[in-house]
Curated annotation (Swiss-Prot):
The cytochrome bc1 complex contains 11 subunits: 3 respiratory subunits (MT-CYB, CYC1 and UQCRFS1), 2 core proteins (UQCRC1 and UQCRC2) and 6 low-molecular weight proteins (UQCRH/QCR6, UQCRB/QCR7, UQCRQ/QCR8, UQCR10/QCR9, UQCR11/QCR10 and a cleavage product of UQCRFS1). This cytochrome bc1 complex then forms a dimer. PROSITE patterns: CYTB_CTER (PS51003), CYTB_NTER (PS51002). CDD domains: cytochrome_b_C, Cytochrome_b_N. Its cofactor is heme b. Binds 2 heme b groups non-covalently. GO terms for cellular component: mitochondrial inner membrane; respiratory chain complex III. This is Cytochrome b. It comes from Myotis nattereri. It comes from the Eukaryota. Component of the ubiquinol-cytochrome c reductase complex (complex III or cytochrome b-c1 complex) that is part of the mitochondrial respiratory chain. The b-c1 complex mediates electron transfer from ubiquinol to cytochrome c. Contributes to the generation of a proton gradient across the mitochondrial membrane that is then used for ATP synthesis. A ubiquinone binds at residue 201. Belongs to the cytochrome b family. One of its GO terms (biological process) is mitochondrial electron transport, ubiquinol to cytochrome c. Pfam families: Cytochrom_B_C (PF00032), Cytochrome_B (PF00033).
Length: 379
């Protein structure tokens, strides 16, 4: 008798995706982040669903409903802080996942990579809209500043912003639609994740050497399921420590004040995971230029497969490219720090230099270094 796991139409899909899936025998812990992201997404949808049961998307009651969740709902505070800090874990895993892809040349699986970049945009949009929902000071002013950037688009900008706002300022209509989209988008993201995996399973996983591993594959279960569970336990531990010991570490104190359109906070800044992009936006004095740089800072990932000039896929055996990669990481950390600082000397010039370096490394220095390494191989 055939095993039901291999014969049942639905079980067969699960089996071929998570159990009998052939995986390279040498993939390291950097390959754990895909499964961690899946668990982060499930956690966010689950906690978000329970929060939505108690939340009201009305300007008059939104702030109070969040307070009510924290004070009156059974374990509502756990739900809220799991959701808020779960987003931070989500972005940590996302950035490490993308970094892994850049380091090991996984971007050469163009379809998987491009869906991944679209996913990154979708997750960032969802997180931004979620940050608006508690309707605190930073929520309101963050929404105002970021949506206002669209007014830089020539000709249609102003109309577009008012259309998104549903009026002449960020108000009740804006909050309601942001809640609707914040609820809807994670399900769209889930569907896109399936497409992401579909494309990945067409080619199979890359590995640290960047050499095809077709002749040396092992089943995903039990080897990588056990390995993923270890990563999961470490992530859950970190998340729970954050939630129970320092739940407001990543938040902004201003967001504990109800939104007031008549009082602008002294420094408007987004959550930490958007600070690098915010720093790039602020480093350009021109409004449209800043918006373009902001979008391009993420969109540049789309063209990385076309910028790959090396004869080797992975950076494992390319020391010069490795130096550039870690310079890029240091540059992104610098941008993240600058994004949280006030707009004054010396932060402005540091931000501008870091922004120039960011685009230079990806678009100019990486391809040139790879080209040089190809010639060094001949010596």
């Amino acid at each position: 008798m055939t095993n039901i796991r291999k014969s049942h139409p639905l079980m067969k899909i699960i089996n071929n995706s998570f159990i009998d899936l052939p995986a390279p025998s040498n993939i390291s812990s950097w390959w754990n982040f895909g499964s961690l992201l899946g668990i982060c997404l499930a956690l966010q949808i689950l906690t978000g669903l329970f929060l939505a049961m108690h939340y009201t998307s009305d300007t008059a009651t939104a702030f109070n409903s969040v307070t009510h969740i924290c004070r009156d709902v059974n374990y509502g505070w756990v739900l809220r802080y799991l959701h808020a800090n779960g987003a931070s874990m989500f972005f940590i895993c996302l950035y490490l996942h993308v970094g892994r892809g850049l380091y090991y040349g996984s971007y050469l699986y163009a379809e998987t990579w491009n869906i991944g970049v679209i996913l990154l945009f979708a997750v960032m949009a969802t997180a931004f809209m979620g940050y608006v929902l508690p309707w605190g000071q930073m929520s309101f002013w963050g929404a105002t500043v970021i949506t206002n950037l669209l007014s830089a688009i020539p000709y249609i900008g102003t109309n577009l912003v008012e259309w998104i706002w549903g009026g002449f300022s960020v108000d009740k209509a804006t909050l309601t639609r942001f809640f609707a989209f914040h609820f809807l988008l994670p399900f769209v993201i889930s569907a896109m994740v399936m497409v992401h995996l579909l494309f990945l399973h067409e080619t199979g996983s890359n590995n640290p050497t960047g050499i095809p591993s077709n002749m040396d594959m092992i089943p995903f279960h039990p080897y990588y399921t056990i390995k993923d569970i270890l990563g999961l336990l470490l992530m859950i531990t970190a998340l729970l420590v954050l939630v129970f010991f320092s739940p407001d570490m990543x938040g902004d104190p201003d967001n504990y004040m109800p939104a007031n359109p008549l009082n602008t906070p002294p420094x408007i800044k987004p959550e930490w995971y958007f600070l690098f992009a915010y720093a790039i936006l602020r480093s350009i004095p021109n409004k449209l230029g800043g918006v373009l740089a902001l979008v391009l800072s993420i969109l540049i990932l789309i063209i990385t497969p076309x910028l790959h000039t090396s004869k080797q896929r992975s950076m494992t055996f390319r020391p010069l490219s490795q130096c550039l990669f870690w310079l890029l990481v240091a540059d992104l950390l610098t941008l993240t720090w600058i994004g949280g600082q006030p707009v004054e000397h010396p932060y402005v010039i540091i931000g501008q230099l870091a922004s120039i370096l960011y685009f230079s490394i990806i678009x100019i220095l990486m391809p040139l270094t790879s080209f040089a390494e190809n010639h060094l191989l001949k010596w």
